[in-house]
Amino acid sequence: MLEIKNVSKTFNPGTVNAKTALNGLNLTLNDGDFVTVIGGNGAGKSTMLNAVAGTIQVDTGSIILDGRDITRLPEFKRAAYLGRVFQDPMMGTAATMQIEENLALADRRGKRRTLHPGITQADRERYIEQLKILDLGLENRMTAKVGLLSGGQRQALTLLMATLQKPKLLLDEHTAALDPQTAQRVMDITDRLVRENHLTTLMITHNMRDAIHYGNRLLMLHNGRIVLDISGEEKARLTVPDLLALFSKVSGQEYDNDRALLA
């Protein structure tokens, strides 16, 4: 379970550039929840993920992960419990290392460092089986340098690496930099990995169709607060025009992202 309790964060406090990104945010994710998150620019979406990941420290409130208060836990210590995939496909992998070496690094994240004989044959066989899930042929290119892969292949590999330890998963617009066809494929892989591994997931997206189609719950943020929280049959019946109308109703504004309108 992941709980965000009355969390607030203001950047540049006490200056003319002060910006309240999170304003008493409250959110509870039960185990296995796949929650999609939308909102206009500056709504607080990425700040929320950064707060959970420990990239930033919150001003007030607390963050509880599986009953443990991690509010002040350093980012590197949270890595054992959290997997994150960013928008840029180049960020999650080491380009000069082989595919199997990248997987081995991810496999050992958060584990105690010991002397061992590198990648064992058992490791290699396990990685091959994991790569087959992607259906991209990467299981036949284990020793290829990751820098030779396409953006979509690298993002799919990053996603697999992020889920090896069965963590809570944070997805920060992880398909936004991909072409539509590749983005759809990565989203299908995402859905499969989340479902098969029963991963608790927070996914930010500007694609309203994806926000509606994937996951069991949909949140909309506005001015650092959750203004919509939709699940079940209500979510299943939603259309993009419905969602745009709901946003206008609760926020008093038009949704300000062209990608959402074109999705």
Where are these regions (language model features)?
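The feature captures the beta-strand-to-loop junction immediately N-terminal to the Walker
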Residues: 38-40
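H-loop/switch region of ABC-family ATPase nucleotide-binding domains
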Residues: 205-206
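Helix-to-loop junction immediately C-terminal to a conserved catalytic motif
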Residues: 53
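Conserved ABC transporter NBD signature motif
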Residues: 61-69, 228-230
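ABC ATPase NBD coupling module
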Residues: 15, 69-83, 91, 113-120, ...
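Conserved beta-strand-loop-alpha-helix hinge in the C-terminal portion
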Residues: 225-251
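Q-loop/switch helix immediately C-terminal to the Walker
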Residues: 96-109
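A short, flexible loop at the N-terminus of ABC-type nucleotide-binding domains that lies
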Residues: 1, 10-24, 74
